[in-house]
Amino acid sequence: MHKRTYLNACLVLALAAGASQASAAPGASEMAGDVAVLQASPASTGHARFANPNAATSAAGIHFAAPPARRVARAAPLAPKPGTPLQVGVGLKTATPEIDLATLEWIDTPDGRHTARFPISAAGAASLRAAIRLETRSGSLPDDVLLHFAGAGKEIFEASGKDLSLNRPYWSPVIEGDTLTVELVLPANLQPGDLRLSVPQVSYFADSLYKAGYRDGFGASGSCEVDAVCATQSGTRAYDNATAAVAKMVFTSSADGGSYICTGTLLNNGNSPKRQLFWSAAHCIEDQATAATLQTIWFYNTTQCYGDASTINQSVTVLTGGANILHRDAKRDTLLLELKRTPPAGVFYQGWSATPIANGSLGHDIHHPRGDAKKYSQGNVSAVGVTYDGHTALTRVDWPSAVVEGGSSGSGLLTVAGDGSYQLRGGLYGGPSYCGAPTSQRNDYFSDFSGVYSQISRYFAP
């Protein structure tokens, strides 16, 4: 994972800003896309620093045994049921979750803060994240308490006391490797004996989420899938903007520690500063506890058509911090989140239309099938307002070639506006399609953005 240079970021911003300014003024039921102006904080994108860079990691920590291989295989079926997220991690619990802070090696920084490091490991894990409970004996945790997280990669993520809740565990970012190193930083007026720390469970990934520079899932999708960069529209400003609005989602269930993948889209809005509105599927995020664990992966695509893993975009960026649920309708499978952290520079706020989609429309989908690098599918809307698998007000899309798969859930159904820009019209629920499917099964179903817009319109304007 590499940081964009200042000049490259400015170039992206300038080009996209020009596209935004050329867009028609949005009406009451639609809005053109726009470029991101604010930049993500280093702490939320893996560019934090240890408070005590040269400190050793304490021997005291928590170790989890590897899960049975059969359990790992059973958790990640090749063809998950429609309307279910793709599982990529399994939960492991321990009967002894407490860590005695007095046993850690504490070192003070020059400004008087107290620091210590400890490991959380799981045998054989390719990637790992941990549920952490940290609280003072009086209850509330000061905002200036810091936690730093690192794995085998170069990334160091940061959380503060205000990110941790007394009501539920805080799930760390996903790190590479089988050992998560945690640095705990306490303000000068807080002593280790004032705190209680426990790690009740971890989420265990058998395959690396970040292997060799974000090659996770690379090539794992079906043979009929098309790299986003291979689309005939690739290289046009409108299409490239649309791809920059799409992110891979990784989230964890606090109930069992299982981790899952979906796809989501950043949506434009008229607020100043912009709100980080993020569209996906209700079946991906079931409750606020799960939304709080969300991390999004941006710019995960190849830079060459049908390129190998070496062509993965070097600007891939992970954003941590979770999200809040603004709207969720399980029956319609609609979901609107608000990311708690600002996405990285270079992302795009996708335009949208709340006008009902017309039967016969040409639909486009940019998604992450099986967690693979970004793919593109194009199809025809063959039915609107239909019921499928117990869900209502869905839009059916027929695929002539490339389809969608597990991990694509929540990805946006896009249409092209009169000015050539893309507009979001719904999100993927699922269906019977797969590479090699007969014509009768080469179709999938999307939620309808227009059907719930009256419920969510207040979030898109001041």
From Swiss-Prot:
SUPFAM superfamilies: Trypsin-like serine proteases (SSF50494). Keywords: Autocatalytic cleavage, Disulfide bond, Hydrolase, Phosphoprotein, Protease, Secreted, Serine protease, Signal, Virulence, Zymogen. It comes from the Bacteria. Its EC number is 3.4.21.50. GO terms for biological process: proteolysis. The modification Phosphotyrosine is found at Y429. InterPro entries: Peptidase_S1_PA, Peptidase_S1_PA_chymotrypsin. Residues 25-211 form a propeptide. Lysine-specific endoprotease. Involved in corneal virulence. This is Lysyl endopeptidase. The lineage of its organism: Bacteria, Pseudomonadati, Pseudomonadota, Gammaproteobacteria, Pseudomonadales. The gene is prpL.
